[in-house]
Amino acid sequence: MRPILLQGHERALTQIRYNRDGDIIFSTAKDQHICAWYAHNGERLGTYHGHQGAIWTVDVDPTTTIIASGAADNTVRLWDVKTGKCLKTWDFNTAVKRVEFNEDATQLLAVTEQRMGFLGTIVVLDINLDVNGPQSDDRALTITCAESKATVAGWSYMSKYIIAGHEDGSVSQYDAKTGELLFNTQVHEPDLQVTDLQWSPDRTYFITASKDKTAKLVNARDLEVMKTYVTDTPLNSASITPKKDFVILGGGQAAMDVTTTSARQGKFEARFYHKIFEEEIGRVRGHFGPLNTVAVDPNGKGYASGGEDGYVRVHQFDKGYFDFTYEVERQARQQ
């Protein structure tokens, strides 16, 4: 797997997203702009300028018409993908750490930071998919996280629940219509934050990554932990691969703790685990610092990782990846 190296950011990457077709990658970093790239050759499609602080998060609607971003300038912005025009800006009291469209992109959730006396919240905004139409200023729903602030959040299948990961290592399930807290489960070790939450293709289960050096596969309906992937380094990101039963984990020794260690000692690799058997099956090296974000092509043909080193590395899976099977998997096919 020879990677395509994308050099468009001057500072550490914060999030990467593929569009639903898997042909465009959107990346955000701490350098105040969003980049769009063609996934197959790494050509830069364009950049989106307007934020005045580090951009923490980005998401794209299913039709690749609009993207949303959240940043340290306390705003959520909506952009026209084709023209790069900023369609709408929503202001908040604190930084926005995560945005995600629901399945039909009629709503957008935003996770705000707990800071300066303001509690962390999850806010739902109504979205108009017509780029020439008006956008509403109103918040459709506000969930206040009084116990422990939310660090990540997303929509479950059919936009039925909002699932949030918290700073104290717990995961919550909220009713997406009313904002009522339905479940709260201590998925990770207490006081080690959930750093990422990404969905299976059908959104019935999700994977979380945490500073406790594990990733967990969790059922969205009752927050039951189905699988646990144990590593030897704090994790920043985790993703589920379609087509094959794998998960990809990214992390590494925290950037502030890295002194003169080699890349190998820092454990700056993307790790592949078997989704069912919970065993590590391979690693991909390359970044000169922790991996902050990993994302998988929705078609299952490749993945991209973004690091503290400011690079995005896009990998296309080769034949060996698709051919790899366990003995029990081969036997099951033959029967």
From Swiss-Prot:
Q: Transmembrane ranges?
A: none
Primary location class: cytoplasm
State the Gene Ontology BP annotations.
formation of cytoplasmic translation initiation complex
Record key words, sorted: Cytoplasm, Initiation factor, Protein biosynthesis, Repeat, WD repeat
Select a single GO molecular function from the record's annotations and give it: translation initiation factor activity
Where does each WD repeat begin and end? 8-47, 50-91, 145-184, 189-228, 286-325
Q: Which GO terms describe its cellular component?
A: eukaryotic 43S preinitiation complex; eukaryotic 48S preinitiation complex; eukaryotic translation initiation factor 3 complex, eIF3e; eukaryotic translation initiation factor 3 complex, eIF3m; nuclear periphery
- Does the keyword Cytoplasm belong to this entry? yes
Could you tell me where this protein is found in the cell?
A: Cytoplasm
Check the record and name the Gene3D superfamilies matching this protein: YVTN repeat-like/Quinoprotein amine dehydrogenase
Question: Tell me, how does this one assemble?
Answer: Component of the eukaryotic translation initiation factor 3 (eIF-3) complex.
Similarity section: Belongs to the eIF-3 subunit I family.
Protein role: Component of the eukaryotic translation initiation factor 3 (eIF-3) complex, which is involved in protein synthesis of a specialized repertoire of mRNAs and, together with other initiation factors, stimulates binding of mRNA and methionyl-tRNAi to the 40S ribosome. The eIF-3 complex specifically targets and initiates translation of a subset of mRNAs involved in cell proliferation.
Q: What name does the UniProt record give this protein?
A: Eukaryotic translation initiation factor 3 subunit I
**Source species of the chain:** Botryotinia fuckeliana (strain B05.10) (Noble rot fungus)
